[in-house]
Swiss-Prot record:
Coiled coil: none
Organism: Yersinia enterocolitica serotype O:8 / biotype 1B (strain NCTC 13174 / 8081)
Keywords: Cell membrane, Membrane, Repeat, Transmembrane, Transmembrane helix, Transport
Protein name: Putative transport protein YE1478
Segments passing through the bilayer: 8-28, 32-52, 66-86, 94-114, 118-138, 158-178, 383-403, 406-426, 447-467, 475-495, 541-561
Any one GO biological process: potassium ion transport
Gene Ontology cellular component list: plasma membrane
GO MF assignments: monoatomic cation transmembrane transporter activity
Family per record: Belongs to the AAE transporter (TC 2.A.81) family. YbjL subfamily.
Subcellular location: Cell membrane
Protein topology in the membrane: Multi-pass membrane protein
Entry-linked InterPro entries: AAE_transporter, RCK_C, RCK_C_sf, Transp_YbjL_put, YidE_YbjL
């Protein structure tokens, strides 16, 4: 049996789509030295190549892909979006605005200088900033514009070409910039990280290991009673001195949970809960009492839960204010905008932060009720909320403003982004509403992006040869300028106008570029996870601003041309 592959693919849009995705994802796994191409650029390159062979895809698939991606970006940004405006939030907002604004101005200027159309200009901006939200925002606005001006169809095709030509330039230049720019300024990054750590009392260890607490039981001997010297448990401060706390006491055969007034007596059997290294450092007075195996003493269900910060008595407060150890709980991680933060008593909590806490199930539940709620451990998505807010986003996108003879529509990208932010924010405040498992959210977001990339590549591939020869060199130079110059501008603005600590500043700059690989390099250079504070500060707001920038550059383009 003879199978004509070309006819088979052209006659089956779904098959063509998944062939493009599979080949593109394979290509995206290739590495050029330390640089991995990535899924987005892999799918785009394959779709451009197949597009040259006149393979096409239904445009509705492209539209659905970008809609899912943008909506998920909003959902992820929602929990921490509004907290950006507190504490250092003003600085982070201004840095993100400077980064996105300067990049957009440079792209517009270079586009006019070289005589490009808006498709190449917006694509170059998206690729240089390694930002798919820019590409998606520009693509959505262009589609609405093309409906009124079919002559712009070529600009739509050029959008993916500009992105493909400049993406690697943007990624490689930023990674090299992250490695070498900190060395060109006069302040040492590790010193800056230690300085902010001293000012805020933060732990600078970027390689902190996390263990689950364990429980062991001991019989109280004379040495331990002598060490206690008649003090009750509150006066002794067992946790401060040992890193463990006493969960239970058996005295005269009676098992009880002790309060702070309890005094240790010879013959008591106590269960101690703490991290393994805390047990190993116990004062000899504890270990000299015989370790015992008592099923009831050791029968404690230690759980690890993710607690979402919500309540006013925790938001804006330092970790020390929670006094987790006084409640017999252990903090393993602090996560903000999917970024792991430094763990220290002086870290200030934002609404939507996630605390990973271990301890007795009853104690963890009690702590969760005081500071927020335990994140749902479910694989079931609240599809009703997902669909309802998706519809709301599409309805918002239909809103149009009329100014004299000029009309401006919000568009699907901005509408879905706003609806996603609302859903994410409400989810962070209401534990049973709008739950989407992180794995499901990541899958929908990634799949939507890949479908969008496949669509724009197949649509543009037919005209790539004619455009590539004319603008290839200009694109590479422009991509380098738009990638690095805004980083330098942000550094000057942050260092000399905002006077930010350099470790926080470089982390914030990488967050404004939403580039995790560059952030890893900054943390390695600083030998600290302090820069993650800055990265988390700008990351959420930058994703939103970059999407809006993609739409805005298309809207203002006619005015730039004069």
């Amino acid at each position: 049996m003879n199978i004509n592959v070309a006819n088979l693919l052209n006659g089956n849009y779904i098959l063509l789509l998944f062939v493009v995705l599979a080949l593109g994802l394979c290509l995206g796994k290739l590495r050029l030295g330390p640089i991995q191409l990535g899924n987005a650029i892999g799918v785009l390159v394959v779709s451009l190549l197949l597009g040259q062979q006149h393979f096409t895809i239904n445009t509705e698939a492209l539209n659905l892909g970008f809609m899912l991606f943008i909506f998920c970006v909003g959902v992820e940004a929602g929990p921490n979006f509004f907290s950006i405006f507190f504490r250092d939030g003003k600085n982070y907002l201004m840095l993100a605005l400077v980064m996105v604004g300067s990049a957009m101005v440079l792209a517009l200027g270079l586009g006019k200088l070289f005589g490009w159309d808006i498709g190449l200009t917006a694509g170059m901006l998206a690729g240089s900033m390694t930002s798919t939200p820019v590409l998606v925002g520009a693509g959505d606005t262009l589609r609405h514009t093309i409906a009124n001006n079919p002559a712009l169809q070529h600009a739509q095709d050029n959008l993916s070409l500009g992105y493909a030509l400049t993406y690697l330039i943007g990624l490689v230049s930023l990674i090299l910039g992250a490695r070498y720019l900190p060395k060109l300024q006069h302040q040492d990054l590790p010193t800056s990280a230690q300085q902010i750590a001293r000012e805020r009392g933060l732990d600078t260890d970027s390689q902190r290991k996390v263990y689950l607490p364990v429980i062991r039981a001991y019989r109280v001997g004379p040495e331990l009673v002598a060490w206690a010297d008649g003090k009750n448990l509150r006066e002794l401060g067992i946790y401060r001195q040992t890193g463990c706390y006493i969960e239970r006491i058996r005295r005269n055969g009676i098992l009880a949970n002790p309060d702070g007034d309890a005094v240790l007596q010879v013959g008591d059997e106590i269960s101690l809960v703490g991290y393994p290294d805390a047990h190993s450092r116990l004062d000899p007075s504890f270990r000299n009492g015989k370790e015992v195996f008592d099923r009831d003493l050791l029968d404690m269900r230690i759980v690890t839960e993710e607690i979402v910060v919500k309540n006013s008595n925790a938001v804006g407060k330092r970790l020390s204010h929670l006094k987790l150890t006084d409640h017999g709980c252990f903090l393993n991680r602090v996560i903000r905008s999917q970024i792991e933060m430094p763990i220290d008593d002086n870290v200030v909590l934002n609404k939507g932060d996630v605390l990973q806490v271990s301890g007795d199930a009853r104690r963890v539940k009690s702590v969760a009720e005081k500071i927020g709620f335990i994140s749902i451990h479910s694989q079931v998505t609240d599809l009703l909320a997902f669909c309802a807010f998706f519809i709301l986003g599409l309805m918002i996108g239909l809103i149009t403003f009329q100014f004299s003879n000029f009309s401006f529509g919000i568009g699907n990208a901005a509408g879905l982004l706003m609806a996603g932010i609302m859903l994410g924010f409400l989810r962070a405040n209401h534990p049973t509403f709008g739950y989407i498992p992180q794995g499901a959210l990541n899958m929908v977001k990634e799949f939507g992006l890949m479908v969008f990339m496949a669509g724009v590549g197949l649509s543009a591939g037919g005209g790539i040869n004619s455009s590539l020869g004319a603008v290839g060199g200009q694109m590479l130079i422009s991509g380098l300028i738009v990638s690095l110059v805004p980083v330098v501008i942000c550094f000057i603005f942050g260092a000399y106008v905002l006077r930010m600590n350099r470790a926080l500043l470089f982390g914030a700059i990488m967050g404004a570029r939403t580039c995790a690989p560059a952030m890893d390099i900054i943390s390695d250079t600083a030998r600290s996870n302090i820069p993650a504070l800055g990265y988390a500060g700008t990351y959420a707001i930058a994703n939103v601003l970059l999407t809006l920038a993609g739409s805005l550059i298309v809207i203002v383009w006619p005015g730039i041309l004069g």
